A protein has these predicted regions:
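Conserved small/polar residues in nucleotide/adenosyl-binding loops
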Residues: 1-5, 309-317
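N-terminal ordered "arm"
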Residues: 3-71
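Long, hydrophobic alpha/beta structural blocks
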Residues: 40-233
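Beta-strand/loop nucleic-acid-binding surfaces
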Residues: 270-283
């Protein structure tokens, strides 16, 4: 899993990885960083790597014994966004999940890797959730086709390489930018409901933007024309190429390797996310106001309940 280098495991070999996972499981169980679902005999162990990063180790319980199946690195999100509807589906090769999310502000359909797996498994049975009496996690059933509406999502991303760009010269007054964004949101919502006028206005707006870019690209550098971008990258559906303004910046130290990790909140096309990147993999000096450009693995935590990030708290589903 090469993406682990984003949170400070640049030179992690197989032997050290196995030892770290084993020690992390024992230590986390002792400290109570364990989530268990007794209906499915599944569980997760949280290994903290720095203040806001860690490893999410998923497995199954056989009695009191925890049997490791897979893990993934994660970072805690610092922002959240609203969405109209999400659907969640299991990956074929293991008991991990992808989320398809219609982000309400931008109208963009996002696909990301679900962080809080155990919260979702609990939500399947919950009376305020999907209300499923029976659920076979090993079989692809109808539960994955049930839309989940109006849940906040905290987007995060891991990057194994990127560069820092200077800000673009174009400056828009905050009040004017907010007004334009609000108007665009209204058009997007109306278009989703079938409003032909809204669809036509959005189409004309896109054509005008395309024509303007086609003329300017002949004389200007592409990164001086636009402030940010967010687009799919590669063959994996949760990989994106992003350019975004850095709104917040912190440095954290990996407790195991002592490598430095940059934690950035960036804004891409009015979409905020928290990004982790290893200092050794970043070209340039990051600073608030500058821009980050790189390929990211998009993750997200869905607030199935009012309290977010319950996947970091020890609890048990009876």
């Amino acid at each position: 899993m090469y993406k682990r280098q984003a949170i400070g495991f640049q030179y992690l070999d197989a032997d050290f990885e196995e030892e770290m996972i084993h020690a992390g499981i024992l230590d986390s169980i002792e400290k109570g960083f364990v989530i268990k679902n007794t209906k499915l005999n599944r569980g997760a162990v949280i290994v903290r790597v720095s203040e806001s990063t860690g490893l999410y180790i998923y497995g199954r319980f056989k009695g009191d014994e925890f049997i490791y199946e897979y893990y993934f690195p994660f970072i805690l999100g610092k922002t959240s966004c609203d969405n109209d509807e999400i659907t969640i589906e299991r990956h074929l090769d293991k008991e991990s999940f992808a989320v398809v999310c219609d982000e309400s502000r931008t109208g963009v359909t996002l696909i990301f890797y679900l962080q809080n797996v155990m919260d979702y498994l609990e939500f399947i049975f919950d009376k305020d959730g999907l209300k499923q009496k029976e659920y076979n996690i090993d079989r692809k059933g109808s539960v994955y086709r049930i839309p989940i509406k109006n849940k906040k999502v905290s987007l995060t991303a891991l990057s194994i390489g990127g560069m820092i760009l200077l800000p673009s010269h174009r400056k828009v007054e905050p009040v004017k930018a907010k007004k334009e964004q609000d108007e665009r949101e209204k058009l997007i919502q109306a278009a989703k409901k079938g409003d032909e006028t809204a669809i036509e206005n959005l189409t004309i707006e896109d054509i005008d933007t395309y024509n303007e870019l086609s003329q300017r690209i002949l004389k200007e550098d592409v990164f001086s024309i636009f402030d940010s971008s967010f687009m799919p990258c590669g063959v994996e559906c949760d990989q994106y190429q992003v350019v975004g303004e850095i709104l917040e910046l912190e440095e954290e130290i990996n407790h195991y390797t002592k490598e430095t990790v940059y934690i950035m909140v960036i804004e891409c096309n009015n979409l905020s996310m928290t990004v982790a990147v290893n200092k050794a993999d970043l070209l340039g000096e990051p600073a608030v106001g500058r821009r980050f450009k790189g390929q990211v693995w998009l993750q997200g935590s869905v607030a199935f309940k009012a309290v977010s990030y319950t996947h970091l708290r020890a609890h048990e589903t009876k």
